[in-house]
Curated annotation (Swiss-Prot):
The gene is OFP13. This is Transcription repressor OFP13. Transcriptional repressor that regulates multiple aspects of plant growth and development through the regulation of BEL1-LIKE (BLH) and KNOX TALE (KNAT) homeodomain transcription factors. One of its GO terms (biological process) is negative regulation of DNA-templated transcription. It holds the Pfam family Ovate. One of its GO terms (cellular component) is nucleus. It is found in: Nucleus.
Length: 260
C-alpha cells in the first residue's frame, strides 16, 4: 500500500497560487488611524506632502482631520525667530552705544610696557612732590601762621617789642638760624604797627640780633652788622617812616626840655 503524504497549504497563498490579498483601508476614520497619522505629521513639522501622496497612486488617502488638531509650528517658529532676531539686534546696538559713550574703547598708553614699573614711577614722583612741598613750607613759613597779633597799650613800647621778639625766637628756634626768617619777622612787625612805632621796632630788632650774636644762637656778626646798616640806612632816609618817627621823637624831647 502506498503511503499518503499530508501537505499543509500556505495561509498566504490564494486559490490561484498567488499572495493572499489583504484588503486596504481606504477610509481612515477610526481613532487609531488618526493618532498614527497625527504623530507622523508632528514629527515632520506638520507638513502635508501632497506630492508624495499623489505619487503613491492613490493607494493611501489622506485622512480628514480638523485643522484645530495641529498647530502651524513652522509659522510660530518663524515668528519667534524674527522677534528674537529683532531683540538681539536692539540689544547689540545698545551695548555698542554704551561702550562708546563710556569711553571704554579709549586708553592712554603708559610710558613703559610694565604696569609695576609705571606704578613705582608714579609713587616715586608723588613722594618727591610731597617732600618738596614739605621743605618749602618749612623754609618759607609765613610769620602769620606762627604768631597772633594782639593790640595793647604799652607804656614801654621798646621793652614790649623786644620781649615779643625774644619770645618768637625762643618758641621757634629756626628763626635764630635763618636770616631770611628774621627779616620776615621784622617786616611783619613793621606792617602790623603804625609808622610811629617803626623806630622802636627797628631798635628792638637790632638789640635782639646783638643779644643772639653774643649768646651764640646762630646769628653771626656779619648778620648783626648787616641789620645795623639796614636800620641805619632806613632811618636816614627822609621819606622813610622811621626817619619821620625819629624826627618827631627828637622834637618831642626838645619840647619837653624847653618846658622844664
Amino acid at each position: 500500500m502506498g503511503k499518503k503524504k499530508m501537505k499543509l497549504s500556505s495561509l498566504f497563498k490564494g486559490g490561484a497560487g498567488g499572495l493572499l490579498a489583504v484588503p486596504l483601508c481606504y477610509n481612515a476614520k477610526t481613532l487609531s488611524f488618526r493618532v498614527g497619522d497625527d504623530m507622523i505629521k508632528t514629527v515632520n513639522s506638520v507638513f502635508f506632502d501632497h506630492h508624495h501622496n499623489n505619487n503613491n497612486g492613490g493607494d493611501l488617502l489622506e485622512a480628514e482631520t480638523p485643522e484645530s488638531w495641529f498647530t502651524n509650528s513652522s509659522e510660530t517658529a518663524s515668528h519667534s525667530t524674527e522677534s528674537d532676531q529683532d531683540l538681539d539686534a536692539e540689544s547689540l546696538e545698545m551695548v555698542v552705544r554704551g561702550v562708546v559713550r563710556s569711553e571704554r574703547l579709549f586708553f592712554d598708553p603708559g610710558v613703559t610696557s610694565s604696569i609695576l614699573e609705571e606704578i613705582e614711577e608714579k609713587s616715586k614722583s608723588d613722594l618727591k612732590s610731597k617732600e618738596t612741598v614739605a621743605v618749602g613750607e618749612d623754609r618759607s613759613t609765613p610769620i602769620e601762621e606762627i604768631s597772633v597779633a594782639v593790640a595793647m597799650e604799652s607804656e614801654d613800647p621798646y621793652g614790649d617789642f623786644r620781649r615779643s621778639m625774644e619770645e618768637m625766637v625762643t618758641s621757634h628756634g629756626e628763626l635764630a638760624k635763618d636770616w631770611e626768617s628774621l627779616e620776615s619777622m621784622l617786616a611783619w612787625y613793621l606792617r602790623m604797627n603804625g609808622r610811629k612805632s617803626h623806630g622802636v621796632i627797628v631798635s628792638a630788632f637790632v638789640d635782639l640780633l646783638s643779644g643772639l650774636s653774643d649768646s651764640g644762637a646762630g646769628i653771626t656778626s656779619a648778620s648783626v652788622s648787616d641789620s645795623a646798616r639796614y636800620s641805619t640806612a632806613v632811618s636816614s632816609l627822609p621819606s622813610s617812616p622811621v626817619y619821620s618817627l625819629s624826627q618827631g621823637q627828637t622834637e618831642i624831647q626838645e619840647e619837653e626840655r624847653r618846658s622844664c
